[in-house]
C-alpha cells in the first residue's frame, strides 16, 4: 500500500526548501512555478497531487516527514498523528496508519470527527440517498489560525472563520450524493 508524504521534507519551519536555479523543487517532479509560486507553491502542488490520487479512487493514507538531520527541521516538525483506540504498540500504529486513520500537521493538532467517527472511516449510503455528515473538531494550537477549510473531492467546499469555530466546535455538515472524499485543514 502507498502512503503519501503530504507534509513533506520540503516544508521547513520558516521557509520552503526549493532549488534557487529553477525556483521549484529541489528534487521530485517540478511544479509550474508561475501558477504555484514560492513560498506556498510547493504545499499546494503536494496537495494537488494527493487530491488527484484520491479523485482516482486510490485510498492513500496521509503521512509526513521532516528530514531532521538533513534539513534544519527539528525532529517531528512535520508529523503524522495516528488514531489508535486499541492497545498502543508498533503493529497497531502501522495497521491504523495504513488504514488511513491519520492526519498530518506541522502546526495545529486537529482532532476532527465526522458523525462521531475518527479520520479514515468509510461511510456508506443506500443507493440514490444523500449522506449528510456532521463535522466537529477540537483544535489545539500555538499558531494563529485564520480559518478552517473543508475540502471535498479536491475543491474547497466550505471555509469557516476560526472565530466562528471557537463558538461551538462545529464545522457544519458535508453532503454526498455519490462516492467521494473530504478532508479538514487549518490555515495558519
Language-model region placement:
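Active-site gating loops and adjacent loop-to-helix segments of metal-dependent hydrolytic enzymes
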Residues: 1-40
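C-terminal functional module detector
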Residues: 10, 35-41, 46-188
Amino acid at each position: 500500500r502507498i502512503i503519501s508524504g503530504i507534509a513533506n521534507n520540503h516544508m521547513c519551519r520558516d521557509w520552503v526548501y526549493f532549488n534557487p536555479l529553477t525556483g521549484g523543487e529541489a528534487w521530485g517532479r517540478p511544479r509550474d512555478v508561475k501558477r504555484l509560486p514560492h513560498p506556498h507553491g510547493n504545499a499546494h502542488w503536494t496537495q494537488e497531487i494527493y487530491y488527484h490520487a484520491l479523485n482516482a479512487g486510490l485510498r492513500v493514507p496521509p503521512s509526513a516527514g521532516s528530514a531532521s538531520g538533513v534539513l534544519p527541521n527539528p525532529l517531528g516538525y512535520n508529523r503524522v498523528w495516528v488514531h489508535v483506540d486499541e492497545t498502543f504498540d508498533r503493529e497497531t500504529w502501522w495497521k491504523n496508519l495504513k488504514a488511513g486513520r491519520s492526519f498530518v500537521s506541522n502546526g495545529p493538532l486537529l482532532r476532527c470527527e465526522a458523525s462521531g467517527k475518527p479520520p479514515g472511516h468509510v461511510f456508506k449510503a443506500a443507493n440514490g440517498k444523500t449522506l449528510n455528515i456532521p463535522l466537529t473538531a477540537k483544535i489545539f494550537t500555538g499558531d494563529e489560525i485564520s480559518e478552517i477549510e473543508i475540502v471535498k473531492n479536491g475543491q474547497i467546499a466550505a471555509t469557516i472563520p476560526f472565530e466562528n469555530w471557537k463558538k461551538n466546535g462545529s464545522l457544519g455538515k458535508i453532503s454526498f450524493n455519490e462516492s467521494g472524499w473530504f478532508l479538514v485543514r487549518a490555515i495558519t
